[in-house]
Amino acid sequence: MEKILNKLKKSKFRSSFHLNKKMRDYVTDKGIDVIKTHAYDFVNKRLKIYDTNKDGKQTPMRQVHPVFIAEHATATCCRGCIEKWHHISKTKILNDNEIDYIVNVIMKWIESEMDS
């Protein structure tokens, strides 16, 4: 996982995402375990099954939830980005191991943001 996170840090676009104060406060207030639950919920509802009509549009880019910002920063925001960066086919239904991997990447990034 460190290898992909380091690669993402070198991307001008991916490295431009950061949690603002409001998002950091939200993580602190809710707690990391609740944020992880949200991440699982978003990934299962928005990314598990590939939808050609929604892919690339399902994750807001505004600072509305820390998981959304993390998804853009970690290229887990849509199935096209997941395929390009994480080499998981965009047309297959994500299995539990793939969902765990995606959520762990998201959470590692959020934890890193909270520590910086």
Residues covered by each model-derived region:
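Core of compact, soluble alpha-helical bundle domains
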Residues: 1-43
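Iron-sulfur (Fe-S) cluster-binding segments and ferredoxin-like electron-carrier domains
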Residues: 80-100
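Immediate flanking context of iron-sulfur cluster ligation sites
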Residues: 54-74
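Short Fe-S-cluster ligation motifs
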Residues: 101-116
